[in-house]
Amino acid sequence: MFMLRQGQAHDAQALCTLIFATAPELLPVVLGDKQCLKTYLAHALMLPNGQYSAARHQVLVIHDQQSQDEQVVGCITLWHDDLGADFVNQTISAMINVFTSEQLTQIARINKTLLSVFVPPSRNELALGHISVSPEYQGLGLGKKLIAYGIRQAKLLGKQQVVIDVDSDNEQAVCFYESCDFMTTASTQLALTGQTFLRMVYRL
């Protein structure tokens, strides 16, 4: 039986794998080699707030009634235009605690480029991020459960649109979001990786 709940610190290891799977080309360019990236995520996921905080994610878990064990098999996070100062401060704090000053300067430089491609959500939008399902559980409708959760939250927050950025080469993902009634409204190339990202929108 699958259940959706708020992420917790003990979900960090599973979330690290799921989050990396959402952007395997981009994340190492932004946050360093695989080991550096894992170190950063391991730290950031344990914080109570911030972009990569486990608590900022909803996780899909499969529950074994006999053993009472849980396995995290999917995740999603939500971003809007007013995440608060604590979100920003803890995102920055996580970086300061892991990266050198040279690395931080590089990340800040790259971030300016990223913001021109991954445009932050406007006041009437809710952005979905880190949508991921473990490969062995794909094809069971779990991705649609995550999308449905995001749409419900957008309605509760009074938003007019749900947005997501998708690598245009990820045909499986593009087709999936189209099947969930998302439409492509923009296409932008990211020179850092040579990828083209589609801004896909679901209108409420």
For the regions a language model picked out, list residue spans one by one.
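Conserved GNAT-fold acetyl-CoA-binding loop/helix
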Residues: A23-L45, A85, I96-S101
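Conserved GNAT acetyl-CoA-binding A-motif
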Residues: N124-L126, A154-D165
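Conserved N-terminal entry element of GNAT/NAT acetyltransferase domains
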Residues: M1-H10, V73, R203
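Active-site rim helix/loop that mediates acceptor-substrate recognition in acyltransferases
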Residues: K34-H57, Q65
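Conserved beta-strand in the GNAT
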Residues: V59, D69-H80, A127, S132
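C-terminal "cap" of GNAT-fold acetyltransferases
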Residues: I96, K159-E171, S179-C180, A186-L204
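Conserved acyl-donor/pantetheine-binding loop and adjacent beta-alpha core of acyl/acetyltransferases
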Residues: D82-E125
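Conserved acetyl-CoA-binding loop-helix of GNAT-fold acetyltransferases
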Residues: G139-R152, C175-S179
